Curated annotation (Swiss-Prot):
Signal peptide: 1-20
Claim: Cell membrane is one of the keywords in the record: yes
Superkingdom to which the source organism belongs: Eukaryota
Source organism per UniProt: Rattus norvegicus (Rat)
Full protein name: Glutamate receptor ionotropic, kainate 4
GO process annotations (BP): chemical synaptic transmission; modulation of chemical synaptic transmission; monoatomic ion transport; synaptic transmission, glutamatergic
Entry's family note: Belongs to the glutamate-gated ion channel (TC 1.A.10.1) family. GRIK4 subfamily.
Function: Ionotropic glutamate receptor that functions as a cation-permeable ligand-gated ion channel, gated by L-glutamate and the glutamatergic agonist kainic acid. Cannot form functional channels on its own and shows channel activity only in heteromeric assembly with GRIK1, GRIK2 and GRIK3 subunits.
Length: 956
């Protein structure tokens, strides 16, 4: 059988074929609240009837008639009596009532016996135990669907803990789907039932003490509003509580009495405000209330009135479709007879196939007579009323608009005043010097005050700074409560906690934190002991005594090796007569013992020496020594600068292990702070030992504030364990304080909020924005820097030890060994190619070593063959005289005097040819050079000390 579909605006000519009465189609409506100033049900039925009868498409003169019967109380007897009055009138359907479950059950049974369709407009009661009649249809959404929708919302918000307030015991059966989900997910759902006094105050106090932030209320609209008003009196209507109402009429209640418009209230609605008749329908009801009532009871049409309006249209649509297939007739029935309406079953089949768009959305029924294929709108309370943030569809499930929800949170911060709890702590929050003349937030200054101003500018909120009552950050007590700022957040006495509040796992369990705005760690603060005053020999401090000793040994070793190598290598022995190469029997070595000791000194002082090494071995010794001195002098200069610019200070401990391994220096931290919790919960052996010491030490080593800890450090032998940021701040302002070692851990400061705060994401984004813009770093430099002590990485300069520069000593030793080896190779090579073949290698080696050990003179004769004569100098080839020549006296002989020039050249050439040792002819420029010789008193005639006098460059 095809589905019956018809719009409410168009009704074809169905009124032509009504057998029993060609002039009317009668419907009965039972109202249990028929007053004009209540729901407006009577008016809604009248509006539906008049709109149908005024339809221009209606053919014929038949009209829809709706007989209204009043039910003054929910009584089975009165309900049965009313039905006995309705049946003789020959009605095609019975509508209502809207709020009498017992009466509705009696009506369904009677209509089922007589096969007369019955439309319910109230939520189901006792779903598990009541059998739905075939003739009964319910336009109201089922409680099962509502419970599934609530479960979807809880999943969307990741809610694992909630409380359900029930006005009746039947709510556990009605919300079975919701309870089943909590059982499956193992989340926590506490159920609280209103007692006979109907006072929700005790229940709300229990919920507040349990710190439950999500509250589900399953009650009628009036009771739901009462619960919310009581919650407002207890301070539970704020941004940290979420209320979900299952009643579909709750959004029609007035919220003028709610002071805090940041409260997160969610509800459902089924109204179709886009319907063509919805605005006219609402205006008609509102006008009726204004004319007949002292006040308007609802902000919009009641749900029951809209459902009755849609029920009239559903009946008319089904009768129209049925009348097209067969002629129907309605005859009077009686309670006393067993007679039934013969067309009732057919009409019910057509009613189950009805599809139309009504004031309450899409109208369609399933095989059980329950409404299907519809959507529940999810509404959220704002300062401008409720607005839709999503919907739940029977077939498609939950669909939330996250953008609308997030924008509502941002809008709720706009121009909202937040209570900020904090604590006086330099430099985070301080009182101004003239704070007595100020009031409010103007009395305070510091890093946190400036950060609050930046956040307020971004998020557009106002704030009120309030100092915490007990002056502590917050620690758990034995009874489970918390002190300090954490306790105020748990009690919802404050919206934010802005201070040096450390993010810890224990605090994260009871409050929410924003992203960290500052990263830090625990450090050790201790006072420094001034070292001795600089002495006359403080210039020796850059190197440790061991380094100075090794440098002296290195100098002696280089001098000895240089003396040895220079004696061994033949390339350091040279003729002192430049003009008598090959003929002079004497060779000279410039590296005497004195010169060998002086040459390293000149290199070390970077002044050089007139002695130039000739052999490769001696040059190797010189190179490694110069490299050694380069590193040594550079290191000394750098470390000496540190000693001259930084005053040396001494501390008896260098690390946390040194502190833990001694008992002479007391150490402690702030009582009730995160540092104390860190040591208390640490599993590291060193930190456990430190905690046992601090916990058992008497008198107590814990302090109440940072200022007290600083004073104790300066006035006694005490080390203070505190955050590195505070350590840095106080070291900038007191040069007698120093940090020992590095950080003991890594953590961060965050903004504390109550659990479930809707502002958490907004503050996270704002903090990230400040970090990206470098604003937080700028604020930190503003409040941390500017002290009288310069910032130093380590104010205790130390002399360099062998572990720092030992490598250059290794290089020096290796170079010396290589030089000795090369000198021996040079000695052997020259000896093998010498003219004296009768002398053995060992004999020559022993002779040289004996000369080195005895420090003999650095002159010895040239080695010659046995019996050989000194070589004769070659005869100079006569050359033609040049046009000009330079004489030994420096005079020039030009071309104008050729005879004189030729005569002079011939004389000097003859002298050179006879072996004269005081005249030399340069083969390149043909210049004569004179050499004067004087006999040495200590040597033979061949042992001469030559003094060269020349008026030109050095000889060859």
């Amino acid at each position: 059988m095809p589905r019956v579909s018809a719009p409410l605006v168009l009704l074809p000519a169905w009124l032509l074929m009504v057998a029993c009465s060609p002039h009317s189609l009668r419907i009965a409506a039972i109202l249990d609240d028929p007053m004009e100033c209540s729901r407006g049900e009577r008016l809604s039925i009248t509006l539906a009837k008049n709109r149908i009868n005024r339809a221009p498409e209606r053919l014929g003169k038949a009209k829809v008639e709706v007989d209204i019967f009043e039910l003054l109380r929910d009584s089975e007897y009165e309900t049965a009596e009313t039905m006995c009055q309705i049946l003789p009138k020959g009605v095609v359907a019975v509508l209502g009532p809207s709020s009498s479950p017992a009466s509705s059950s009696i009506i369904s049974n009677i209509c089922g016996e007589k096969e007369v369709p019955h439309f319910k407009v109230a939520p189901e009661e006792f779903v598990r135990f009541q059998l739905q009649r075939f003739t009964t249809l319910n336009l109201h959404p089922s409680n099962t669907d509502i419970s599934v929708a609530v479960a979807g919302i809880l999943n969307f918000f990741n809610c694992t803990t909630a409380c359900l307030i029930c006005a009746k015991a039947e709510c556990l059966l009605n919300l079975e789907k919701l309870l089943r989900q909590f059982l499956i997910s193992k989340d926590t759902l506490s159920v609280r039932m209103l007692d006979d006094t109907r006072d929700p105050t005790p229940l709300l106090k229990e919920i507040r003490d349990d710190k439950t932030a999500t509250i589900i209320i399953h009650a009628n609209a009036s009771m739901s509003h009462t619960i919310l008003l009581k919650a407002a009196e207890l301070g539970m209507v704020s941004a940290y509580y979420t209320y979900i109402f299952t009643n579909l009429e709750f959004s029609l209640q007035r919220m003028d009495s709610l002071v805090d418009d940041r409260v997160n209230i969610l509800g459902f609605s089924i109204f179709n405000q886009s319907h063509a008749f919805f605005q006219e329908f609402s205006q008609s009801l509102n006008q009726s209330w204004q004319e007949n009532c002292d006040h308007v009871p609802f902000t919009g049409p009641a749900l029951s009135s809209a459902l009755l309006f849609d029920a009239v249209y559903a009946v008319v649509t089904a009768v129209q479709e049925l009348n097209r297939s067969q002629e129907i007739g309605v005859k009077p029935l009686s309670c006393g007879s067993a007679q039934i309406w013969q067309h009732g079953t057919s009409l019910m089949n057509y009613l189950r196939m009805v599809e139309l768009e009504g004031l309450t959305g899409h109208i369609e029924f399933n095989s059980k007579g329950q409404r299907s294929n519809y959507a529940l709108k999810i509404l959220q309370f704002t300062r401008n009323g409720f607005r839709q943030i999503g919907q739940w569809h029977v077939a498609e499930g939950l669909s939330m608009d996250s953008r609308l929800y997030a924008s509502n949170i941002s809008d709720s911060l706009f121009n909202t005043t937040l209570v900020v709890t904090t604590i006086l702590e330099n430099p985070y929050l301080m009182l101004k010097g003239n704070h007595q003349d100020m009031e409010g937030n103007d009395r305070y200054e510091g890093f946190c005050v400036d950060m609050l101003k930046e956040l307020a500018e971004i998020l557009r909120f106002n704030y009120k700074i309030r100092l915490v009552g007990d002056g502590v950050y917050g620690v758990p007590e034995a009874n489970g409560t918390w002190t300090g700022m954490v306790g105020e957040l748990i009690a919802r006495k404050a919206d934010l906690a802005v201070a040096g509040l450390t993010i810890t796992a224990e605090r994260e369990k009871v409050i929410d934190f924003s992203k960290p705005f500052m990263t830090l760690g625990i450090s050790i603060l201790y006072r420094v002991h001034m070292g001795r005053r600089p002495g006359y020999f403080s210039s020796l401090d850059p190197f440790s005594p061991g380094v100075w000793l090794f440098m002296l040994l290195a100098y002696l070793a280089v001098s000895c090796v240089l003396f040895l190598v220079a004696r061994l290598t033949p390339y350091e022995w040279y003729s002192p007569h430049p003009c008598a190469q090959g003929r002079c029997n004497l060779l000279v070595n410039q590296y005497s013992l004195g010169n060998s000791l002086w040459f390293p000194v000149g290199g070390f002082m970077q002044q050089g020496s007139t002695i130039a090494p000739r052999a490769l071995s001696t040059r190797c010794v010189s190179g490694v020594w110069w490299a050694f001195t380069l590193i040594i002098i550079s290191s000394y200069t750098a470390n000496l600068a540190a000693f001259l610019t930084v005053q040396r200070m001494e501390v008896p401990i260098e690390s946390v292990d040194d502190l833990a391994d001694q008992t002479a220096i007391e150490y402690g931290t702030i009582h009730g702070g995160s540092s104390m919790t860190f040591f208390q919960n640490s599993r590291y052996q060193t930190y456990q030992r430190m905690w046992n010491y601090m916990y058992s030490k008497q008198p107590s080593v814990f302090v109440k504030s940072t200022e007290e800890g600083i004073a104790r450090v300066l006035n006694s032998n005490y080390a203070f364990l505190l955050e590195s940021t505070m350590n840095e701040y106080y070291r900038q302002r007191n040069c007698n304080l120093t940090q020992i070692g590095g950080l003991l851990d890594t953590k961060g400061y965050g903004i504390g909020m109550p659990v479930g705060s809707v502002f958490r994401d907004e503050f996270d984004l704002a903090i990230l924005q400040l970090q990206e813009n470098n604003r937080l770093e700028i604020l930190k430099r503003k409040w941390w820097e500017g002290g009288k002590c310069p910032k130093e990485e380590d104010h205790r300069a130390k002399g360099l030890g062998m572990e720092n520069i030992g490598g250059i000593f290794v290089v020096l030793i290796c170079g010396l060994i290589v030089a000795i080896f090369m000198a021996m190779l040079e000695f052997l090579w020259t000896l093998r190619h010498s003219e004296a073949s009768e002398v053995s290698v060992c004999q020559e080696m022993m002779t040289e070593l004996r000369s080195i050990i005895l420090c003999q003179d650095n002159i010895h004769p040239r080695r010659r063959r046995s019996g050989g004569l000194p070589p004769q100098p070659p005869v100079l080839e006569e050359r033609r005289p040049r046009g000009t020549a330079t004489l030994s006296n420096g005079k020039l002989c030009g071309a104008g005097e050729p005879d004189q020039l030729a005569q002079r050249l011939a004389q000097e050439a003859a002298l050179v040819a006879r072996g004269c040792t005081h005249i030399r002819v340069c083969p390149e420029c043909r210049r004569f050079q004179g050499l004067r010789a004087r006999p040495s008193p200590a040597r033979s005639e061949e042992s001469l000390e030559w003094d060269k006098t020349t008026n030109s460059s050095e000889p060859e």
